Every structure is written in C-alpha cells, then in structure tokens.
A protein has these predicted regions:
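Flexible, acidic/Gly-rich N-terminal and inter-domain linker regions that tether
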Residues: 1-61, 328-330, 337-366
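Conserved, mostly hydrophobic/aromatic
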Residues: 36, 75, 96, 208, ...
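N-terminal pre-triad scaffold of radical SAM enzymes
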Residues: 50-79, 104, 112
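Cysteine-centered iron-sulfur cluster-binding motifs in ferredoxin-type domains/subunits
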Residues: 64-76, 86-95, 99, 103, ...
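Acidic, low-complexity intrinsically disordered tails
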Residues: 140, 356-382
Length: 382
C-alpha cells in the first residue's frame, strides 16, 4: 500500500485503539525538490558539538550533493523504498550547480566534491514512463530477479549532470561514492556511463554491494546473481585497462542474512579466496524496521514467496558466518575450523592452494603446538 496511485489507507486494531496509516503522498515534483535544497543551509554541525571536538566525518556530508530521492532497487534488507518511495524524484541541474558553487565558497573546501548521488547514485529518473501515470507495479520489481523489459536504463542525464559539476571553477574532482547499481549500469547497452565513471569519478576504489554469491541467499536479499557481479567486475577491469588507470572494486558483503546458511557462507569465503579479496570490515545482518529481511528474521518466512528460510539467530552461528569472510584473520581460526567441519568441508583445511585454513608452520607459526585436522565425525548440516 506504499504506492501513491493505488495504495489504500491501512487500519489495524491495537487493544482498544486503532493504528491508522494514511495513504502515502505523491512524489515531490522537481520544483519542490529544488525549493527544499535551495534553502540556506549552514552545511555544518550544530555549535553544541564543538565541546566534543566537532564531528570528524562532517566533510563527507559537507562536500556532497544529493541529486535524487527514492529507489526502485527494492533490496530486501533496505527500507528506503518504503519511506522515500520507488518512484525517483530528482533535482534540476541548475539547482545542483547552485549548491556546488556554494560548496566551492566554503573556507575549508579543497576542490573535491565527495559525492553527487542519493540512495542509488545512478537512478536519475523513474524506472519507466508508466510509473508517473499509474504508479509502480504491484506484482513485480524493476530489477529483480531480472531487469524489467520496460526499464529505462538511459544514463545520459546523469552523465550530463556530472560533466557540468566537474567543469565548475574551483572543482578539481567529482566523486561518486553513494553507490551505484551495477546491474542497472549493465542493462544500459551504451557503456558511456561506465567510461565516464572510471575516467573521472572514481577515487581509486569503487565501492559496490554484491552482498553475497550464493544464488538462494541472493534471492532472499532481492539482489542480482553472482554472474552479474562477475560481468561487471570484468567490464570495470577492462575499462580501466583501456584508459590506463589502476582502480579497484571494493565489494560489500552481508553475513547471516535470513536464508543464508553456513554452507552459503563457505561458498562466499571460497569466492573471496578466488578473487583475492579479504574484507577489512564485515556487515553482520541486523534486523531494522521496515524491511522484508527483518520480517524474515523474526518469522522465518520470506514474505514474497511464503517459503520458510533458515535464520542464523544464535550468536555463535552468526560468528562462524562472519569469521568465514575473514578466514585469514588468526583470531578466526577456531571458528573457521568449526564451520568447515560442520559443513563437511575438510578439503578446505590443509596446505593446498584452495584451502581456507592453512596448517603448515609457514602459514601458522603456532601449528606445531595447535594442530588442526578435519574430524569426519562432525558433519552437522545447516
């Protein structure tokens, strides 16, 4: 009922009272968006924070520009599409340029715009013309499980916007850091945006969010399959080779998402091994209000399919999934060992190149005193 065109008022009895959810408003027009962002904001934290030494991360926000609102990505673990809507609302180029010029006048501005984006940076218009006439589809999503045939994947407006901002006097570089949907980028048959992105708007590393590689884990997340990420990874690397730049992808992954089993976590760790990536930070799933994933976490049922899903609620189970993503960390050895034993993956313990847990002294200085071996009697499946 979150669609302004077809959504209804929802009433739920709660004791002797009723909870009423009114019909959601229509998306903001471009004129309304411009009016909001043209207000005279001070672009810094409240003076009360001075006694605490200020806010260290203020620059990331202070020198960033919001260009759009809403998201039609509909990831299961995200509630942005619920409270900002699936219909994209955008600011005009003129409004964004006015703000960028104001940023260049700030005393501590060093020439770098940290971001021009939003919930998803490369969503700069509604996903299809139909949305502005009859609303969003009630029985399907725009990008999952595959991009809709009616999806408008044209990136030309966003390209033109970035070109205008980076051409402004006083601006050395414009980055795109709020995240892009690489499946949406790949759906655009014209690779001009990828070329512009790699040439001008990556700060050496581009953060993307494949979230997982197990197909059924991704299905519960509402994310594209592993093959889509691999296709983007190849396209990104090829483009950077063409333009002579050394730039890298930094993929984000989630552990213990509802529907993700210990076997799925092992599959992810093997993928990380194969691409030579060890994440410094790992996002363990946290149930947050308003998301489908939270409903799965508490009910054990995927609300979209009605099917039961495995949920890792036990702290130890969650710790094993998390440890597998950082299997090279010495602190995680015991957890990784236990996880591999429980999934009957003793083939990943040893000194072979494919092994996640090394046992030789060259890899483990303490190996002589704490020998790790596979126990075939332990074969618990999750």
């Amino acid at each position: 009922e979150l669609d302004p065109f077809s959504g209804k008022i929802v009433v739920q009895k709660n004791g002797k009272k009723f909870v009423v959810q009114n019909q959601v408003p229509f998306p903001l027009s471009q004129e309304e968006m411009d009016a909001i962002y043209d207000l005279d904001y001070v672009r810094t934290y409240h003076p009360s924070y001075e006694k605490y030494g200020g806010v260290p991360a203020i620059e990331e926000v202070q020198f960033s520009v919001i260009s759009c609102r809403g998201c039609f990505g509909s990831c299961s673990f995200c509630a942005i599409h619920s409270h900002q809507g699936r219909i994209i609302q955008t600011r005009s180029h003129e409004s964004i340029i006015r703000e960028a010029k104001k940023i260049t006048e700030l005393p501590n501005f060093k020439g770098y715009i940290h971001d021009v984006g939003g919930p998803t940076a490369n969503f700069r218009h509604p996903s299809c013309a139909k949305q502005l006439k009859v609303g969003v589809c009630r029985d399907r999503q725009c990008l999952f499980p595959k991009p809709c045939p009616n999806l408008d994947t044209d990136h030309s407006d966003y390209i033109a916007l970035l070109q205008k901002v980076r051409a402004l006097s006083g601006i050395k570089k414009v980055f795109v850091r709020s995240g892009i949907r690489y499946d949406y980028l790949l759906a655009d048959k014209n690779d001009r945006f990828l070329d512009e992105l790699c040439r001008y708007h990556v700060s050496g590393q581009l953060k993307v969010a494949p979230e997982h590689v197990s197909e059924h884990a991704l299905a519960n997340m509402g994310k594209p399959g592993k093959s889509v990420y691999l296709k983007f990874m190849r396209a990104f690397n090829k483009k950077n080779q063409e333009i002579g730049l050394k730039q890298f992808l930094v993929p984000y992954f989630i552990s213990s998402h509802p529907g993700c089993t210990l076997r799925d976590a092992v599959e992810l760790s093997e993928f990380l091994r194969d691409i030579g990536h060890q994440p410094e930070q790992v996002q363990d799933f946290i149930p947050t209000p308003g998301s489908a994933s939270t409903a799965m976490y508490y009910s054990g049922i995927n609300p979209e399919t009605g099917k039961k899903v495995f949920v890792a609620r036990n702290p130890h189970d969650k710790a094993m999934q998390r440890a597998l993503m950082q299997y090279k960390n010495p602190k995680n050895r015991q957890l990784v060992k236990e996880a591999l034993q429980q999934t009957n993956r003793g083939d990943l313990i040893g000194d072979d190149a494919k092994c996640l847990l090394k046992i030789s002294s060259s890899h483990n200085p303490k190996a002589r005193h704490s020998k790790i071996a596979f126990n075939p009697k332990i074969n618990k499946r999750r």
